[in-house]
């Protein structure tokens, strides 16, 4: 491991410490094994038909493998049958992020939710290995300050933090009150 990879992982971990204490209130599957976790206060984003509600923090695991485990066992992994995943991921609801660890050089990540760990690990080693000419965004985190942290190992700098293209995330202060009932997507 190079010093650059270790330094990059340390910088990324530093960028993620602000989410410690944020509570997960919505967890769901997207296409395939894409995992979405909304945390912290609720933010309304305007839509064509209706507004949608997202977390002030939104974690999206896309082109990476993942699993949930506690200290004793693996609870579920990304290639389980969808109904099993949909049931098991609900264990994160109501749990707070207590720690985030980033492991170089591949920028594997461990998000600890009150003792239940979400482990994220890359399935590609080079930019474009899944589809020519495109970055392989392993996972991303929308943050309250209006930017997106994207992790793309193999793409030079393994991660970036850039302004969100969603205007409401850039200009609107998040509602930090605790949600009484998670909204449905």
Question: Where would I find each of the regions flagged by the language model?
Answer:
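Surface-exposed, interaction-prone regions used to assemble/regulate multi-protein complexes
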Residues: 1-185
């Amino acid at each position: 491991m190079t010093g650059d990879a270790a330094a990059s992982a340390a910088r990324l971990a530093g960028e993620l410490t602000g989410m410690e204490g944020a509570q997960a209130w919505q967890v769901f599957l997207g296409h395939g094994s894409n995992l979405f976790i909304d945390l912290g206060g609720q933010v309304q984003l305007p839509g064509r038909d209706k507004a949608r509600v997202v977390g002030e923090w939104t974690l999206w695991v896309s082109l990476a493998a993942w699993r949930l485990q506690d200290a004793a066992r693996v609870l579920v992994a990304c290639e389980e049958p969808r109904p099993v995943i949909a049931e098991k991921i609900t264990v994160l609801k109501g749990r707070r992020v207590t720690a985030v660890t980033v492991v170089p050089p591949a920028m594997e990540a461990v998000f600890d939710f009150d003792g239940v760990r979400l482990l994220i690990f890359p399935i590609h080693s080079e930019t474009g290995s899944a589809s020519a000419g495109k970055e392989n965004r392993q996972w991303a985190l929308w943050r309250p300050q209006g930017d997106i942290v994207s992790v793309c190992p193999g793409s030079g700098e393994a991660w970036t933090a850039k302004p969100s293209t969603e205007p409401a995330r850039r200009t609107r202060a998040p509602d930090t009150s605790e949600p009484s009932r998670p909204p449905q997507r």
